[in-house]
Amino acid sequence: LATSAPQGWPRDHKTWDDLRRSASPEIPICEADLIEGFDIDRFLRNFFEKIWNQRDYRKLYEFFDYNLHFEGPTNRKFSGLEHYIHFIRSLMTSFPDLELQINEIYWMGNDVDGYLTSTRWSATGTYSGEGIYGEPTDSKVQIWGITQNQVVGGKIVNEWMLFNEMDLMMQIAASN
């Protein structure tokens, strides 16, 4: 691990806020318009809010198919909702104050064929819990990521998540 933070890290609050505000529009255009049937944009926003920010893990069963297939950072691959729940809980244990914001949602598809989605997000938190990144350091971290989902029948059946885990580890190590 790095002995010091790379140039530009940690970002100051003004830079971070400017980057977060660069997503436009801040709310989805369709939010003002009622959508008949399944609203994929609202579904994804509810998922991220309920699971990542409110930590209502019971809702995972509403959003995900039990046989979920997942691929994520550092070549994580597994099948089954219970493995996904373990992964989410391990991140939340490591970063108990993690707050996630959706920057953009892109999607294509329909109710018959299903949807392919891409959600660009950012998060801030403190590495203050036990976890896979070593002893807690109380390091403030900033994470940028993309989560892609395949949604069929109102359930997420495949998820691909990407964030720079090496950058995250560098932020944690730089505060030591």
Regions found by a protein language model. Give the residues of each.
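C-terminal and inter-domain tail/linker signature
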Residues: 1-176
